[in-house]
């Protein structure tokens, strides 16, 4: 059973004792947590019958562990003013149908680490902009993510400028229709393995890898893909270092289509490996 508790580790306040953390509830109201100099650890019991919609932190928080019922506002960031490590433990997300923009940057784009194994995603149908502009995160562990109900992954990782590794090998994408801009502007990624992706229902891959300027190797093995240029416009735009695309097990129509797309996106010297 979810305990509705938030634990905080706080660094040096540098003499500023007028600091508070606010937990806002979906049903209305909030819990205000005073943060005092010298007190480094906090364990706050939240209201048992309410769902968190927003967590407004302070820059001095080094770690937050959330074990609570969550129902964030669709299309709005769940957490603000936070630049430490965020961990979810046994959270109740049963009232959520989407996680659109849940960790989107903006006020808290300096967040450095996310631990998501306690975040249940089995009922989620949309993850568009979920990690958009998480600019300081270098790695995201998604090994626990259940994506079998997801239909929308538009801009899911867009503008994750510092992201160096991304393992999506466990993603079930058989229901996904929109991958527009999914990895756009992930400028530190050097390789990406999407060989497990089922793209049979996808109707939009526009700008999917746009400005992945350091991407060198892309694995699309097993893809069955036949979108028009309009629906895959600028899919590889700005991938200036892309040299190798693995397409093992792909039919010739898919191979020809991918070649046409990257040629239209003004890429040169890309090698297709089929065996």
Go through each PLM region and give its residues.
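Small-residue (G/S/T/A) turn/hinge positions that recur once per unit in extracellular repeat modules
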Residues: 50, 77, 97-98, 235
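Short, aromatic/basic amphipathic alpha-helical patches
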Residues: 233-234, 254-266
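Structural signature of tandem-repeat unit edges
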Residues: 33, 37-71, 82-97, 108-125, ...
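Acidic, Ser/Thr
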Residues: 104
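Register-specific detector for alpha-helical tandem repeat solenoids, activating on a conserved position
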Residues: 100-101, 128-129, 154-155, 180-181, ...
């Amino acid at each position: 059973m979810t305990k509705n508790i938030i634990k905080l580790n706080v660094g040096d306040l540098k003499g500023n004792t007028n600091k508070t953390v606010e937990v806002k509830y979906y049903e209305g109201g909030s819990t205000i947590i005073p943060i005092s100099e010298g007190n480094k650890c906090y364990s706050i019991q939240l209201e048992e019958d309410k769902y968190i919609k927003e967590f407004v932190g302070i820059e001095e928080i080094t770690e937050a562990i959330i074990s609570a019922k969550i129902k964030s506002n669709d299309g709005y960031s769940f957490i603000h003013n936070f630049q430490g490590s965020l961990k979810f433990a046994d959270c109740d997300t049963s009232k959520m149908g989407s996680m659109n923009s849940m960790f989107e940057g903006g006020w808290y784009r300096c967040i450095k680490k996310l631990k998501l194994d306690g975040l249940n995603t089995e009922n989620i149908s949309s993850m568009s902009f979920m990690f958009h502009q998480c600019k300081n995160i270098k790695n995201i562990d998604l090994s626990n993510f259940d994506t079998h109900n997801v239909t929308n992954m538009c801009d899911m990782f867009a503008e994750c400028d510092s992201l160096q590794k991304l393992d999506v090998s466990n993603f079930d994408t058989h229901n996904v229709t929109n991958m527009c801009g999914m990895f756009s502007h992930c400028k530190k990624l050097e390789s990406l393995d999407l060989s497990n992706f089922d793209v049979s229902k996808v109707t939009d891959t526009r700008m999917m890898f746009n400005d992945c300027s350091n991407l060198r190797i892309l694995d699309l093995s097993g893809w069955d893909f036949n979108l028009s240029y309009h629906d895959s416009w600028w899919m590889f735009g700005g991938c200036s270092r892309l040299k190798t695309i693995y397409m093992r097990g792909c039919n010739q129509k898919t191979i020809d289509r991918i070649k046409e797309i990257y040629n239209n996106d003004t890429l040169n010297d890309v090698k297709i490996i089929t065996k």
